[in-house]
UniProtKB/Swiss-Prot annotation:
The gene is FTH1. It holds the Pfam family Ferritin. Oligomer of 24 subunits. There are two types of subunits: L (light) chain and H (heavy) chain. The major chain can be light or heavy, depending on the species and tissue type. The functional molecule forms a roughly spherical shell with a diameter of 12 nm and contains a central cavity into which the insoluble mineral iron core is deposited. Fe cation 2 binds at E62, E107, Q141. One of its GO terms (biological process) is intracellular iron ion homeostasis. Expressed in erythroblasts (at protein level). Expressed in heart, liver, spleen, lung, kidney, large intestine, small intestine, muscle, glandular stomach, ovary and oviduct. It catalyses: 4 Fe(2+) + O2 + 4 H(+) = 4 Fe(3+) + 2 H2O. Fe cation 1 binds at E27, E62, H65. This is Ferritin heavy chain. Residues 10-159 form the Ferritin-like diiron domain. Induction: By duck hepatitis virus type I (DHV-1). By polyinosinic:polycytidylic acid (poly I:C) which mimicks viral double-stranded RNA. The lineage of its organism: Eukaryota, Metazoa, Chordata, Craniata, Vertebrata.
Length: 181
């Protein structure tokens, strides 16, 4: 049975609708990757609880991003078509530096996808979608990329992963204080 057309749909191009569905999948994938990272650092043989908390928070944030896009899709009269979520590229995140580098790469990919979605919305003359992406995503992405870049820099300066104490201290003193602000 074909999906009936929405009575609320207005100025919402099919290409934008499809791109929003792809972005939903990417946000869910990012959430899945962060969830994997979180529970890796929660293992008894890794035991970096603030890395685990940090990545769990990131996972929840990415899932919220997906849900916000799903809500937008319904508000605009689009249809949500969920796809399979790819498994993370690895199960063993090795160490904090590797995980932070992977997270930085992931956030840059998510940001690039959002920029492409914004470009498409501009080309299809959809100011509402442009505003939505600008308001809810772009600034937050830039801040996340900067934060992860800073974490990578500090872990490298501390000698991670060569010196295990560096990760322990970063976990305790940097990530351990991030939830107090």
């Amino acid at each position: 049975m074909a999906t009936p057309l929405s009575q609320v749909r207005q100025n919402y191009h099919q290409d934008c609708e499809a791109a929003v569905n792809r972005q939903i999948n990417l946000e869910l994938y990012a959430s899945y990757v962060y969830l994997s990272m979180s529970y890796y650092f929660d293992r008894d043989d890794v035991a970096l609880k603030n890395f685990a908390k940090y990545f769990l928070h990131q996972s929840h944030e990415e899932r919220e991003h997906a849900e916000k896009l799903m809500k937008l899709q319904n508000q605009r009269g689009g249809r949500i078509f969920l796809q399979d979520i790819k498994k993370p590229d690895r199960d063993d995140w090795e160490n904090g530096l590797t995980a932070m580098e992977c997270a930085l790469h992931l956030e840059k990919n998510v940001n690039q996808s959002l920029l492409e979605l914004h470009k498409l919305a501009t080309e299809k003359n959809d100011p509402h979608l442009c505003d939505f992406i600008e308001t809810h995503y772009l600034d937050e992405q830039v801040k996340a990329i900067k934060e992860l870049g800073d974490h990578v820099t500090n872990l490298r300066k501390m000698g991670a992963p060569k010196y295990g104490m560096a990760e322990y201290l970063f976990d305790k003193h940097t990530l351990g204080h991030s939830d107090e602000s």
